[in-house]
Amino acid sequence: MTEKAPEPHVEEDDDELDGKLNYKPPPQKSLKELQEMDKDDESLTKYKKTLLGDGPVVADPTAPNVTVTRLTLVCESAPGPITMDLTGDLEALKKETFVLKEGVEYRVKINFKVNKDIVSGLKYVQHTYRTGVKVDKATFMVGSYGPRPEEYEFLTPIEEAPKGMLARGTYHNKSFFTDDDKHDHLTWEWNLSIKKDWTE
């Protein structure tokens, strides 16, 4: 079997797809408006209580609605945690390189908080480049979440790191945490090196 380098491919932009599907997200409502709606519908009241909790959410008015705190590459065979702090200096993060051994199975875990209002259609998008050429684009639907003091955690399905001599090397990733309303909650860049071994 011959080894092949990752090939660049073109995917339709999410905005173009939304246009073709004629999808329009529902208008944004404040948390207070949502809590006041359909008060006499018992099943909806229970659902909202499950989503929002019992009491009023006290939020810092200066905080963004969504705060992405960290990204972790979850890999059982890794010698230690592979975690990036997304609350600090994102420019410094661009200069760091994280290592994955070729062919290992891993998942991406994202920790985030919703601070004020319900957010609909959260998604994690990752563009991957090698020597300046886009070689992959992945979009993961994260879902809709209500505000709460605790962090939420999202795990992608299991993926396999590229393998083979031609696949080894450094990949530059541009990651986006966005939603149906096209709010850019966080955009960051980071590097991933695929190596023959963890300690190579």
From Swiss-Prot:
Keywords: Acetylation, Cytoplasm, GTPase activation, Phosphoprotein
Region Disordered, annotated ranges: 1-40
Keyword Transport: no
Superkingdom, taxonomy of origin: Eukaryota
GO cellular component terms listed in the entry, alphabetical order: cytosol; membrane
First-listed, main subcellular location of the protein, grouped into a coarse class: cytoplasm
Protein name (Swiss-Prot/TrEMBL): Rho GDP-dissociation inhibitor 2
The organism's taxonomic lineage, starting at the top: Eukaryota, Metazoa, Chordata, Craniata, Vertebrata
